[in-house]
């Protein structure tokens, strides 16, 4: 009888479930995975090196392009690192706006995750549902920064501008009749805070719809329960963070354990799993969407009652107002210096981490006192999770690899960076 041997299969980088440019070399015994070898680097753009030749403000838009699904959370960590080194005091209103948009970003990320994860496993409807809600939140991004994805809205010392008084409205087109237009524009008649408040009232019903589709669906359970189990000890040893760690039963959330901005004033719960499998991580992320909604509601209520500055008045860090520049020579000089030479960050080093939708996203910044970083190190949460893929997939069927990649919520912008 011929010798039985394993065969090797390339999964990706063109595979639709590979979430970008993942190349997995799978060693199979029949349909059972014996070893999974992830190959990374296909989306490497040298972000850390590029930052060394750019001023601190010029590097900010690179952050959006790391995890291009959780744009403002990346910016948040970068701004916190600079603020830590320079000892900048951020106005309270700016902190509330940041927290609100960080949670909007978390919902955006989890919506794409639940849509794509369900689509990979075979539940197509979920994908369409998720994109319906993402559209509203993308409009918030666009209203506040002018861009739907790469916003570059956060700034060292605050945010780029205050929240607008109006929302963009849909106009007449061939595919939308008057009745449809009236429905779409119903919540857009007031300010941006009105629109966000309207969304937060509608959103829990939408999450209930997702749970109706998936939570007790027996096919969904068959594809996720007991798949990719990670024990609490292994989750810690493998460097997992975020929903991957909380899904294994460890209540570690930087927003609670090491609060930044105004998270210490927020009332929310940290969902924790029990079994550490794909199903538990799904439940954790769904509950996170509900908790993010709660935080956004608290931010909206505070922002309504407390007007004020949204960026520091230190013009060595933040540009002066347009009006000031037109009438005051000193403001004009500050503006010119800031956007040509940039700000000089004191010599030293700092690490700032945020509770990113995927885990702990950290920025380690080293400065030699110049106007550019001496070294910028990015701690991407997905990097540690992908390293655990071999351990999570071994012994499972090849079809379950897709579910495990989905549950890790991998985006290659941050892994290859």
Swiss-Prot record:
Known function: NDH-1 shuttles electrons from NADH, via FMN and iron-sulfur (Fe-S) centers, to quinones in the respiratory chain. The immediate electron acceptor for the enzyme in this species is believed to be ubiquinone. Couples the redox reaction to proton translocation (for every two electrons transferred, four hydrogen ions are translocated across the cytoplasmic membrane), and thus conserves the redox energy in a proton gradient.
Family to which this protein belongs: Belongs to the complex I 49 kDa subunit family.
Name of the encoding gene: nuoD
MF (Gene Ontology): NAD binding; NADH:ubiquinone reductase (non-electrogenic) activity; quinone binding
Protein's name according to its UniProt entry: NADH-quinone oxidoreductase subunit D
Subcellular location, record wording: Cell inner membrane
Database matches in HAMAP family: NDH1_NuoD
EC number: 7.1.1.-
Species name: Chromobacterium violaceum (strain ATCC 12472 / DSM 30191 / JCM 1249 / CCUG 213 / NBRC 12614 / NCIMB 9131 / NCTC 9757 / MK)
